[in-house]
Amino acid sequence: MTAIDFTAEVEKRKEDLLADLFSLLEINSERDDSKVDAEHPFGPGPVKALEKFLEIADRDGYSTKNVDNYAGHFEFGDGEEVLGIFAHMDVVPAGSGWDTDPYTPTIKDGRLYARGASDDKGPTTACYYGLKIIKELGLPTSKKVRFIVGTDEESGWADMDYYFEHVGLAKPDFGFSPDAEFPIINGEKGNITEYLHFAGENAGVARLHSFTGGLRENMVPESATAVVSGDLADLQSKLDTFVAEHKLRGEIQEEAGQYKVTIIGKSAHGAMPASGVNGATYLALFLSQFDFAGPAKDYLDIAGKILLNDHEGENLKIAHVDEKMGALSMNAGVFRFDETSADNTIALNIRYPKGTSPEQIKSILENLPVASVSLSEHGHTPHYVPMEDPLVQTLLNVYEKQTGLKGHEQVIGGGTFGRLLERGVAYGAMFPDSIDTMHQANEFIALDDLFRAAAIYAEAIYELIK
């Protein structure tokens, strides 16, 4: 058979690929718990994006299935073995700091800007077109492909729990998720959130009325705001000095004898907390110089003096390193304090390697004398597919052939749908020289990378199912 130029095949379909991708990116598919009902398990946005994706697949001649608006799939080909491709249509909150409307896709200087451009609507569409090329060329295959799209990957994966329970099909035999980076992700750390709990008593000469920071546990808080009152001498001048020293932005608004203090850092993916600047921990550090008392003081001291830049849990004594999987990472992701509440929290999203466990981490955190600790019900254990597995070898071979770069295994702190299968990995779509803007303002994907990824996906899928 004549060798197929997958890059040329993508070139023929570039405009169609972008048109379909734009139609997905224009949908605000953030989870919205305030609008959850029986028809919209995570709010209307994720459902709308799922329906649009399945509409595209219907148009292209696939038989689709929507599993109660939690997730959906279509299948291609025949065979006893099934290759699963797992993607998602939900996105993290857009947040602030964008130069463009996050839901008006914008191409500028060879980059496509929008929330979801790189995580995960762009890679999903590239992978979809990779399979579409195989279908349209009529290439011979011996295995079935099930392309599965979820709507709750960025939160608790309740979409996949429901999907597998109700779809009436066995899990695919092997597969990948186009939701990370090349050359491959064949290992993922465990993922759990642990919560520190504080009371709200607040009797110092300085008073903390509220403290709020962070949108999601798996995002570094870009900004945080506290409402304070009392003895706060030279508050403005001290803030000016503080933000200049730490290269931050900040502001104070006065209203009815209270001060609303905001500090702005930089958001990032919670699996890579060191690449962000946690506005909440810096705000706590700034406020801790004033004379707060009781649980309010404890809250600020923990956040500002222990959690600040403690990306591997050293200060909390939970640090752990595995030779193959690397170091534990920790993101202090969501901060909620209200003086009228008896339960004020800091959410710690922890990505842990083999050799430790959520229960062990919790027992160490319980040594903190000023806070109680609870463990989220939903988590993921560490996952690893050996380099010798034919799935890993095939994907790396295609990557090497198309890029000329040496493939190698990688373990990440991020969690992808690849871990849903025992023989599951993540594969693209970010390249080693790409700029990672996932979960950040001004998220983008370079168009050249998008099209390169589509060609790699086309050849990789074909090699796996031919």
Regions found by a protein language model. Name each.
Residues 120-201, 240, 312-324:
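Acidic/histidine-rich catalytic neighborhood of metal-dependent amide-processing enzymes
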Residues 72-74, 226, 257-264, 346-348, ...:
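A generic structural motif
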Residues 54, 125-132, 161-164, 197, ...:
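Predominant activation on well-ordered alpha-helical scaffold segments within soluble catalytic domains
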Residues 63-67, 251-255, 332, 375, ...:
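Short beta-strand
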Residues 186-212, 217-266, 270-330, 357-372:
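Acidic-enriched catalytic cores of C-N bond-cleaving enzymes acting on peptides and small amides
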Residues 82-149, 155-156, 173, 441, ...:
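Active-site metal-coordination/substrate-binding segment of hydrolases
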Residues 271-342, 351-366, 372-466:
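An extended, acidic, His-containing surface patch that forms the Zn2+-binding/catalytic region
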Residues 2-115, 136-141, 263:
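Acidic/His- and Gly-rich active-site-bordering loop/insert found
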